[in-house]
Amino acid sequence: MFGSKIFSRLFFKRTYATYKRFDNTTSSSSFTTSYAHLLTNRKTLYIGGGLLGFYVYNLHDAPYTHRSRFIWVPYWLETKIGDYSYRQIYQQFQSQILPHSNPLYNRVSTIMNKLLDVALNDNINDDLNARFLNHLKSLKWEINIIQNDSLPPNAFILPNGKIFIFSSIMPICKNEDGLATVLSHELSHQLAQHSSEQLSKQPIYMVLSTILYTITGVSWFNDLLINGVLTMSASREMESEADHIGCELLARACFNPQESINFWHRMSQAEKKAAGIVSQEGGYLNTWEFFSTHPATSRRIADIQKWMPQLLQIRESSGCYEYGRFYNFNKSYFSH
């Protein structure tokens, strides 16, 4: 939900390179001729063919949704970046992290253990390839609850399995099903390798930015165009995908998917109050989605309502109404 923002701040303070503009006195005809020559050059064609082959070879289907996406970043690099992010964040909030003896830690770990058991279960999850599943199982999962109600409500999971939850989000979660909504969403970002997908696209965005700059000579316009048309759109798509996967996970783990709708209603009210944007009628205004990294909350609610019949069916077929479904659940992915 919010993890991608922190991830981006740490590694991509500026997504696109800034280029010095050289002599721009070339006529339009010479400009066109130069590009035509470049495009028909045999070496250029070889390089372009190789890059196209590399792109096609690294197209993979996302779990659950089966969306085709480009990912070339290896697991070890994704984990190393997660380690770097973890050290930065832990150093910043170390004094505010609750001890494992705190009741809230036990509450969060119980929910996460159920979600991880469903997500990493070989007999249940056939959407993840065996190699990636083993990679996820090898991670040292860890929960860090940051006690500071003055901070914005937030939660995220890094690619190395480190989980961060801000105490300010707990009143919005309200109950276990609401908390499961947040945690399953964040876990879904890692199951779908959204961090790797974002990293994989950065070179493409930089190349496009360079090409646009040679045409327009205006870097801010190029940034605006690429952000609005590509970057923001891709981010919203990944957020919606995490919503979808997360809802399926929590339904399989026997949480109530209908509470997800209530959670997003509460989140919507919290966001609007924090923004302080009030309409003339006394209500709150919606932000323009086009330049947002996240879908509008109303859209997220509508999506979950659309998925609800399927989610309830998944929950029923998971044996959630059988006595003792999690009664003997003792497996823990977290070391104390």
Swiss-Prot record:
Binds 1 zinc ion per subunit. It is a single-pass membrane protein. The keyword Magnesium does not apply. The chain crosses the membrane at residues 155-173. Disruption phenotype: Cells are resistant to rapamycin and display reduced TOR signaling. It holds the Pfam family Peptidase_M48. The keyword Chloroplast does not apply. GO terms for biological process: mitochondrial protein catabolic process; mitochondrial protein processing; mitochondrial protein quality control; mitochondrial respiratory chain complex assembly; protein quality control for misfolded or incompletely synthesized proteins; TOR signaling. Keywords: Disulfide bond, Hydrolase, Membrane, Metal-binding, Metalloprotease, Mitochondrion, Mitochondrion inner membrane, Protease, Transmembrane, Transmembrane helix, Zinc. Protease activity is induced in response to various mitochondrial stress. Its main location: mitochondrion. CDD domains: M48C_Oma1_like. Belongs to the peptidase M48 family. This is Mitochondrial metalloendopeptidase OMA1. It comes from Candida albicans (strain SC5314 / ATCC MYA-2876). The lineage of its organism: Eukaryota, Fungi, Dikarya, Ascomycota, Saccharomycotina.
